[in-house]
Amino acid sequence: MSDARPFRFGVTTASAGSRREWVEKARRVEALGYATLTVPDHFPDRLATVPAVMSALDATEHLRVGSWVFCNDFRHPALLYKEAATLDLLSDGRFELGIGAGWLRAEYEMTGIPFDSPGVRVARMEEAVRVVKGLAAEEPLDFAGEHYRIAGLVGAPKPVQQPLPPLYIGGGGKRLLSFAAREADIVGICAKALPQGGLDEADITVESARRKLGWVRAAAAERSTMPELNVLLYAFELTDDRCEAAQRHAAEFPGLTARDVLESPHILIGTAEQMAEDLRRRRDVFGFSYVVLNTGVPDHLDQFALVVALLAGQ
């Protein structure tokens, strides 16, 4: 089972003050050579995921656009299937479906949605994935789980990409990553979610990545093809002075040293050439071929594109 895949690069964002701004951003992402634009699913200060994805798909020709990620607790999986299949159908097969268990306690509290224990939220998401996959089949779905019940529902419409758009599931814990390794087309290695909500910002070391990838490979051992492996960049800086930049970024991540920062697969610092070499090495060592930028700094889109250009076709 080989991990080797060509590089793909993406950005995740959901901010725009107008239709024109959003359309121009999507077209800019495509023009700069990125493979994907992904849209988060959060309440505060963000565009709504489904219409933003459809707008970006409609504004571009080749760019793949996805959810990063649909929070399972915000919608029923039958609705999620219908929205995902419709997005794929209306884009001629350019949608990518990301789904997660939810982790940001604050937005649960703001909206009155119960923030259940991690085990319950993950179990509910696991059932949701089974419902979504079941609705992709031709026959009516009957499903009786602990969290969802479906009686004779036929999934419609059917997506262009069969049986479903590529499914992304990311996480930082063993249970979620093992499930992703068995069920997803794309597995994302992320900082682990804390039981009280939020993310463990120190959980981005090279040692953490090795441990998580061990869980993924063990769970995916019976699959004929290894899922595509994704890593999210939490920090990025184009600079000629890696050491100075690493010292500054270490102060932003509790418990990390400058060396930890330079070695972390979730952080990219240096010249464009140094970054390209780091990404080649990380693909060789870890298998990471799909890299997504998530910093929120406008200039980073153009700066990271320099790295994307160096690795085009590799």
Question: Which ranges hold each PLM region?
Answer:
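Active-site-adjacent structural elements that line small-molecule/cofactor binding pockets in enzymes
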Residues: 1-314
